[in-house]
Swiss-Prot record:
<comment type="similarity">
    <text>Belongs to the D-glutamate cyclase family.</text>
</comment>
<dbReference type="GO" id="GO:0016829">
    <property type="term" value="F:lyase activity"/>
</dbReference>
<protein>
    <recommendedName>
        <fullName>Putative hydro-lyase BceJ2315_40370</fullName>
        <ecNumber>4.2.1.-</ecNumber>
    </recommendedName>
</protein>
<dbReference type="InterPro" id="IPR038021">
    <property type="entry name" value="Putative_hydro-lyase"/>
</dbReference>
<dbReference type="Pfam" id="PF07286">
    <property type="entry name" value="D-Glu_cyclase"/>
</dbReference>
<dbReference type="InterPro" id="IPR009906">
    <property type="entry name" value="D-Glu_cyclase"/>
</dbReference>
<dbReference type="InterPro" id="IPR016938">
    <property type="entry name" value="UPF0317"/>
</dbReference>
<keyword id="KW-0456">Lyase</keyword>
């Protein structure tokens, strides 16, 4: 299935699940959508936190298309599920933004680690959340983001359990893709990140960690949602964690070496 066909299936309501493992050679994007009055500070926030918030594209005020991501793409309808935040609280999850769209909304598309999973799989590195049919586990850490204006919050990480040799290979592979979070930020000791229980992720689903495996943590594009909650904007919208925007950007084009 091409990215365009995948987006069409989302748009007509045929697909509503997590997007990991779909359209493998193509990049997926996290979303943050907020009023134009706050967009400059949020842009500075992304620039100050590039590991968690690598920008793939930024829309014009009111625009629900970013041509660089896909010609037939509609931000309002092409994500399986959206989180709506009001005054810093998650108030609802919706399957379309058509009724909520505002002329001053600015869209930020942020790189997603699902994008490099195809590269890991090609190297024979198993991905437990894909194997188990679950959403990737994501955890809010005790690490504060670099603040920019009203935006702060805490770093969120995704976790994939890997054997030592696979973890080393994963570092080598993912370091080539800083536009989709790059290399892991930590391996092996979740308490050093302020994570007490790997079986209780704040976002996504817990996965099986087998004997001899290490938890490998990548900076995650859900991080901006902690910043949106911290800022307590009157309204802000993001993808539901694990439910991404499929783009026409090839993963190979994002490699820096």
């Amino acid at each position: 299935m091409t990215p365009s066909e995948f987006r069409q299936s989302v748009r007509r309501g045929a697909f509503r699940g997590p997007t990991a493992g779909h359209c493998g050679p193509f990049a997926q994007a996290n979303l943050a959508i907020l009023p134009d009055a706050y967009a400059h500070d949020f842009l500075r926030f992304c620039q100050a936190n590039p590991k968690a918030c690598p920008l793939l594209g930024v829309g014009e005020p009111g625009a629900f298309r970013i041509a660089a991501l896909g010609e037939d793409l509609d931000i309002r309808t092409d994500v399986p599920s959206y989180n709506v935040y009001r005054d810093g609280r998650l108030t609802e999850r919706v399957e379309s933004l058509e009724a909520l769209w505002q002329d001053d909304f600015v869209v930020f598309a942020i790189g997603c680690s699902f994008s490099f999973e195809d590269m890991l799989a090609r190297e024979g590195i198993g991905l437990r959340h894909v194997e188990e049919g679950r959403n990737v586990p994501m955890y809010r850490t005790s690490i504060a983001n670099r603040r920019a204006g009203i935006f702060g919050g805490q770093l969120v990480v995704s976790m994939r359990p890997l054997r030592g040799a696979d973890a080393i290979r994963a570092v080598q592979i993912t370091s080539r893709f800083p536009g989709v979070h790059g290399a892991p930020i930590h391996i092996g000791h979740p308490r050093e990140l302020g994570i007490d229980d790997l079986n209780a992720p704040e976002f996504g689903d817990a996965v099986t960690i087998r004997d001899g495996e290490l938890p490998v943590f990548w900076a995650c594009g859900v991080t901006p949602q902690t910043a949106l909650m911290d800022a307590k904007l009157p309204i802000a919208i993001a993808h539901t964690p694990g439910h991404m925007l499929m783009t026409d950007i090839t993963n190979a084009s994002l490699a820096v070496f």
